[in-house]
């Protein structure tokens, strides 16, 4: 990344490229972040992108957490997670094209439990005055989309035929819209 959400010092990223991108560090202790001081320049870049998408009529599914994190933002602890989510909601909820995605491939984020995801969801529900769309994206394990806070089923799958079958099944089961985010990674 060019910028980071917090003030502080990241681990050494000099050798980070397309080839090394998925070689994750188990020890993230070389990152030195102040989780109480946001890097506003980082968020200004997002401000601009979200506004540009809005002008184009494109929805922005804002992913709050992800498992591909060598910087330690996936393991900040409950207090810092909640503070981060409150900040992001205060900053972006007023954009009419924002959706909240608690995580990309939530089941690969080993630092969070289902209770953590439910707590984070409750922060979003409590803090978002505009009641933007909310969901959580899966890896191999679908989330329980029957939860009241979930507004739509955010799904990933690599089999387009199975996705078609599951769309009907999920619509009938959860009575919510079904969005397939990564069907065969088109594009």
Where are these regions (language model features)?
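Glycan-recognition surfaces
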Residues: 146-187
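Active-site mouth of glycoside hydrolases
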Residues: 1-163
